[in-house]
Swiss-Prot record:
Keywords on record: Aminoacyl-tRNA synthetase, ATP-binding, Cytoplasm, Ligase, Nucleotide-binding, Protein biosynthesis
Gene: glyS
Cellular component terms per the entry's GO annotation: cytosol
Main enzyme class: ligase
Family: Belongs to the class-II aminoacyl-tRNA synthetase family.
MF-aspect GO terms: arginine-tRNA ligase activity; ATP binding; glycine-tRNA ligase activity
Organism of provenance: Clostridioides difficile (strain 630)
UniProt xrefs under NCBIfam families: glyS
Record's protein name: Glycine--tRNA ligase beta subunit
Length: 688
C-alpha cells in the first residue's frame, strides 16, 4: 500500500533568507534518511512560510525493505586454532553479531580466508521507523546562526512551537525535547484560529486555506506578482520586479495583500537609485515606473488582508519619508564639495592593517590599471582610467554611502558627473565594482574593464602576499568572487592577456612587504585555475576537458575557454577511444625522456623514421593553426599521427636495450607529446 506523510514544523517567525534553504535541507535530509533506513517513497514536496516548514511525502511503503547483508569477520588463521576449534576472536565476532556457530562460513579474499556470515533482518513498520527519522530530520538542519530556547539542547533558527506528524490519518507521536508531535496546527497569527485539528492531508490544506495561510510558496509568489501588477496598473505605471526581493517578500508573509503608498514628488529629483535603494534594501518595497521614470509611489505587501489597509499604508509612507529625507539631506551635503575633495579622508580609512589605507589602494590602482591597459593594448584610454582610479573610492567617505553602503560606486559616478568629470571617468568609477555578484552585469567601457580588474587583482595579490587565502567555506574578503569577476570580464571581452603577467604587476605594487614573489605568483595562479574549473563547469564543460586545457600552461582565460569548447566538441568524434589510447601511451613514455633532442642517425626502424618524418610536417601545420586559434582543426591535424604512432608501438620496442636508441625514441615521443601540449593534454581525458 502506498501512504503519505504530513510533517509540519511550526516556528516563531523565521528570517526570510533562511526559509528556502531550510526547506531544501529538510527535504534532502529526509530523503537521505529514507534511503539509509530502506524506506521506499515516490516524492517529497516542500512548502514554507515564515511560521511553518512542511514536507509532504507521497508513495511511502508500508514497511522497510528486508535487509540481507554479508559481514566479514577475522582471518581464518586467527579464527581457528591447530585443533580446528574456534578461537576467542572468532567467538567474539559471533557473539557481537548475535550469531550462532552454524551461521558462519569461510571465504577466500585475496590470499587469505576470512569468516563470513549473512545477516537477515526483517523490515520494521514504516510508522515505527518514522518516529526516529522525523526528529533526526529536524536536528540535522544547519543554520548560519541558530539558537537554543527554554533550557533545551535543541538548536534551530527560531524556537519550534509545534510539530504535526501524520501518516495517512494516524498521528505519529514522538517527543523532541518536550515538543510533542500531534495533529494540531495553527492558522494565521492575526486572522486564523490558534488551534486547528487536522485529520488528513486534504483536511490540512483545506483548513489552512480557510485560516489565511497560502502554504505553497510558488502560489504565494505568483499572488504577490499578480497583485503588484494590478496595483501598478491602477497607478498608470509598471512595477519594477527584482526576483530576489520578490523571493524575500514571499517568505515574509503567509497571506499576502499588496497595496501602494505615496511619497513627495520632490524626491523624484534625486538619482533614481538613491530613491530605489532605501525602498528595496531597507523597506522591501517595489518601485513603480512609467516609461522608465520613477513615479512617486511604491508597492508594499502586507502579511494579512485589507482590513484597515489605510493605516498600514500611512505607516509605511511615514517610514519611507524618513529614509528619503535622509537621502536628500546627504545628497545636498555631499554635492557641496567636488568628489576629489573627499580623497584626503581616505587616508584615515584602513583597507587592511598590513596593506594600508583605502588611499594607498587607490595609488596602487592608478599604477595597476595603467599596466592592464598596456596589456590590453588600450593605451589611448590611460589618462581617463588613471583619473577614474584616483576617484574610485572617494564616495566611500561621503554621507550618502555612509548611510546606504549599497550605493558605493553609483554615488561615485553621480558625484563625478556633478563635479564635471567626463562620461568615461564617471562610468568607470561605477563599473569598477562590477560584477558584484553571480549573474551581475559586466563593465562595458575599456576604462571600467581595466579598473575593475585592477581593483579585484590588487586585493587578491595583497591578501595572498600577507598569507591570507580562502580556506574551505571561509572567504571573509570575497577573494573567490573577485577572481571569478576577473575571469568573467576577460572571457566577455575575449581579449588575449596573460593573467600571470597581471598578477606579477599587482605584486610589484607591494614591494614594501616581505614575501617570496615567485611562490605567491604560483599560489595565485593555482587559485585562479581552481576558479577556472568552477566557472567552466558551470558553463557545461567537462571537468577532464578543463584539466586537459589547464595542463597546457596557458594563462589566457579567453583562450582557455575557446580551447575547452573546441575540445568538448572534438570529443564527439569516431574512434575517440583508439586515439586517446595511443596518445596516452605517448604521454606515459614521453615523461621518461631525459631530453627532446633527436639524433636522426639513431633512427633505425621504418616505423620510427616514418613517425619522425610525418611528425615534422604535422608540427608545422599545428603551429600555424594555433596562431589562428583554430584549435579543433589543430586537434584533427595532430590526431592524424595516430596510425604512425600505433605502428611504432606495434612494431618497435621503444625501451630498447641500447641506451642511446632508447633515449632517442623517448626524445621523439617527447616532441610529439610537447606538440600535443601546445593544444591541450589529451592524456587528461577520461574515457571508457
Amino acid at each position: 500500500m502506498k501512504n503519505y506523510l504530513l510533517f509540519e514544523i511550526g516556528v516563531e517567525e523565521m528570517p526570510s533568507r533562511f526559509v528556502g534553504s531550510t526547506l531544501e535541507q529538510l527535504k534532502n535530509n529526509l530523503s537521505k534518511l529514507f534511503d539509509e533506513n530502506r524506506i521506499a517513497f515516490d516524492k517529497i514536496n516542500a512548502y514554507g512560510t515564515p511560521r511553518r516548514l512542511t514536507l509532504v511525502v507521497e508513495g511511502l511503503s508500508d514497511r522497510q525493505n528486508d535487509l540481507e547483508e554479508e559481514i566479514k569477520g577475522p582471518a581464518k588463521k586467527i579464527a581457528v586454532d591447530a585443533e580446528n576449534n574456534l578461537t576467542k576472536p572468532a567467538l567474539g565476532f559471533i557473539k557481537s553479531k548475535g550469531l550462532s556457530e552454524s551461521d558462519i562460513y569461510f571465504k577466500q579474499v585475496g590470499k587469505e580466508e576470512y569468516i563470513f556470515a549473512t545477516i537477515k533482518q526483517d523490515g520494521k513498520e514504516t510508522s515505527e521507523v518514522l518516529k526516529d527519522i522525523l526528529p533526526e530530520t529536524i536536528k540535522s538542519v544547519v543554520f548560519p546562526k541558530a539558537m537554543r530556547w527554554g533550557g533545551k539542547n535543541l538548536k534551530f533558527a527560531r524556537p519550534i512551537r509545534w510539530i504535526v506528524a501524520l501518516l495517512n490519518d494516524k498521528v505519529l507521536e514522538f517527543d523532541l525535547e518536550g515538543i510533542i508531535s500531534s495533529n494540531v496546527t495553527k492558522g494565521h497569527r492575526f486572522l486564523g484560529e490558534s488551534t486547528i485539528e487536522v485529520d488528513s492531508i486534504e483536511d490540512y490544506f483545506e483548513k489552512l486555506e480557510k485560516n489565511y495561510i497560502v502554504l505553497d510558496q510558488n502560489k504565494r509568489k505568483e499572488m504577490i506578482r499578480k497583485q503588484c501588477i494590478e496595483v501598478a496598473n491602477s497607478l498608470g505605471g509598471e512595477v519594477e520586479f527584482d526576483e530576489d526581493l520578490l523571493e524575500e517578500v514571499t517568505y515574509l508573509v503567509e497571506y499576502p495583500t499588496a497595496f501602494y503608498g505615496e511619497f513627495d514628488v520632490d524626491y523624484i529629483k534625486l538619482p533614481k537609485e538613491v530613491v530605489i535603494t532605501p525602498m528595496k534594501q531597507h523597506q522591501r518595497y517595489f518601485p513603480v515606473l512609467k516609461e522608465g521614470k520613477l513615479l512617486p509611489n511604491f508597492i508594499a505587501v502586507r502579511n494579512g488582508d485589507s482590513y484597515r489597509i489605510d493605516n498600514v499604508k500611512a505607516g509605511n509612507e511615514k517610514v519611507l519619508e524618513a529614509r528619503l529625507a535622509d537621502a536628500l539631506f546627504f545628497y545636498r551635503e555631499d554635492t557641496k564639495r567636488n568628489l576629489e575633495s573627499y580623497i584626503e579622508k581616505l587616508k584615515t580609512v584602513v583597507f587592511q592593517v598590513k596593506l594600508g589605507t583605502i588611499y594607498d589602494k587607490t595609488l596602487r590602482l592608478e599604477k595597476l590599471s595603467a599596466d592592464i591597459l598596456d596589456s590590453l593594448g588600450l593605451v589611448d584610454e590611460k589618462t581617463d582610467t588613471i583619473r577614474a582610479a584616483k576617484l574610485s573610492k572617494a564616495d566611500l567617505v561621503t554621507g550618502m554611502v555612509g548611510e546606504f553602503d549599497e550605493l558605493q560606486g553609483f554615488m561615485g559616478k553621480e558625484y563625478a558627473k556633478v563635479g564635471g568629470e567626463n562620461d568615461v571617468v564617471s562610468e568607470a568609477i561605477f563599473e569598477h565594482y562590477l560584477p558584484r555578484f553571480a549573474g551581475d552585469i559586466l563593465p562595458k567601457t575599456n576604462a571600467g574593464v581595466a579598473l575593475s580588474i585592477a581593483d579585484k587583482l590588487d586585493s587578491i595579490a595583497g591578501f595572498f602576499a600577507i598569507g591570507i587565502q580562502p580556506t574551505g567555506s571561509q572567504d571573509p574578503y570575497a577573494l573567490r568572487r573577485q577572481a571569478l569577476g576577473i575571469l568573467s570580464i576577460l572571457m566577455d571581452r575575449k581579449v588575449a592577456v596573460d593573467i600571470k603577467v597581471l598578477i606579477e604587476h599587482a605584486l610589484d605594487n607591494y614591494s614594501e612587504l616581505d614575501f617570496d614573489k615567485e611562490e605567491v605568483v604560483e599560489q595565485i595562479m593555482n587559485f585562479f585555475n581552481e576558479r577556472v574549473k568552477n566557472l567552466f563547469k558551470d558553463l557545461g564543460i567537462r571537468y577532464d576537458v578543463v584539466d586537459a586545457v589547464l595542463s597546457s600552461d596557458i594563462n589566457d582565460v579567453s583562450d582557455m575557454h575557446m580551447r575547452a569548447l573546441e575540445l568538448n566538441n572534438w570529443l564527439e568524434k569516431d574512434e575517440l577511444v583508439e586515439m586517446l589510447t595511443a596518445f596516452n601511451r605517448v604521454s606515459t613514455l614521453a615523461q621518461k625522456a631525459e631530453s627532446d633532442k633527436i639524433d636522426e642517425s639513431l633512427l633505425k626502424e621504418d616505423a620510427e623514421i616514418k613517425l619522425y618524418n610525418e611528425f615534422k610536417q604535422v608540427k608545422i601545420k599545428v603551429n600555424e593553426l594555433l596562431k589562428d586559434k583554430k584549435y579543433g582543426i589543430a586537434l584533427d591535424e595532430f590526431a592524424s599521427l595516430r596510425p604512425v604512432v600505433d605502428n611504432l608501438f606495434d612494431t618497435v620496442m621503444v625501451m630498447d636495450n641500447d641506451e642511446a636508441i632508447k633515449n632517442n625514441r623517448l626524445a621523439l615521443l617527447k616532441q610529439v607529446y610537447d606538440t600535443m601540449l601546445e593544444i591541450c593534454d589529451l592524456s587528461k581525458i577520461v574515457y571508457k
